Amino acid sequence: MAPSRNGMILNPHFHKDWQKRVRTWFNQPARKIRRRKARQAKARRIAPRPVSGPLRPVVRCPTIRYHTKVRAGRGFTLEELKAAGINKKVARTIGISVDSRRRNRSTESLQANVQRLKEYRTKLIIFPRKAAKPKKGDSTEEELKMATQLTGPVMPIKKVHKKEKARVISEDEKNFKAFASLRMARANARLFGIRAKRAKEAAEQDVEKKK
């Protein structure tokens, strides 16, 4: 077996007929063709729906190390769907992924995904189940003629980077300790309840002493 990760480099002493036991991967080119054919078959099967699957939300990666990066998530929260005015059962039928476990921890993320859903609804073309009897909300015949299968990702996420002009670094910025400030803010948030409880107990003790 080939060495993996950061382990000890092996020094195996082969005595048996080891050439027979060598793991080979000669099936990879055929696998590549098989995967491609499967993708094409799926695209034909789900047409005219998008090839890449349903619409995904914009989420931030977890942990301090990666939370500056934005990527596509698993599904929209029930809160986001409610704010956008979309039923959670209907959402799955019109190509919107739903994740009931995810929670919105900020107003910004909620607003961004609600806006994404609303924009998606404006671009969406819904085919009637029965062509002779179109229901309310189904697209018109002119829109249906314009419909084509989307090959790329649905509403790709754009990573925007604001470029700042060169300027002189101020003395306050030089003295500012970013990591220490973040740690202090996290500590204050963590100890907020404990400190409030201690302050309340201290105030009660002062009142009792005065009596």
From Swiss-Prot:
Taken from the UniProt entry, a GO cellular component term is:
cytosolic large ribosomal subunit
Signal sequence coordinates:
none
Pfam families, per this entry? Ribosomal_L13e
Q: Does the keyword Ribonucleoprotein apply?
A: yes
One GO MF term on file is: structural constituent of ribosome
Q: Which GO terms describe its biological process?
A: embryonic cranial skeleton morphogenesis; regulation of cell cycle; translation
Q: Does the keyword Chloroplast apply?
A: no
Q: Which UniProt keywords apply?
A: Cytoplasm, Ribonucleoprotein, Ribosomal protein
Q: Where in the cell is it found?
A: Cytoplasm
The UniProt entry, under HAMAP family, shows: Ribosomal_eL13 (MF_00499)
Q: Which family does it belong to?
A: Belongs to the eukaryotic ribosomal protein eL13 family.
Q: How does it assemble?
A: Component of the 60S large ribosomal subunit (LSU).
**What role is this protein assigned?**
Component of the ribosome, a large ribonucleoprotein complex responsible for the synthesis of proteins in the cell. The small ribosomal subunit (SSU) binds messenger RNAs (mRNAs) and translates the encoded message by selecting cognate aminoacyl-transfer RNA (tRNA) molecules. The large subunit (LSU) contains the ribosomal catalytic site termed the peptidyl transferase center (PTC), which catalyzes the formation of peptide bonds, thereby polymerizing the amino acids delivered by tRNAs into a polypeptide chain.
Please state what the protein is called.
Large ribosomal subunit protein eL13
Organism (species): Danio rerio (Zebrafish)
Q: What is the lineage of its organism?
A: Eukaryota, Metazoa, Chordata, Craniata, Vertebrata
Q: Which gene encodes it?
A: rpl13
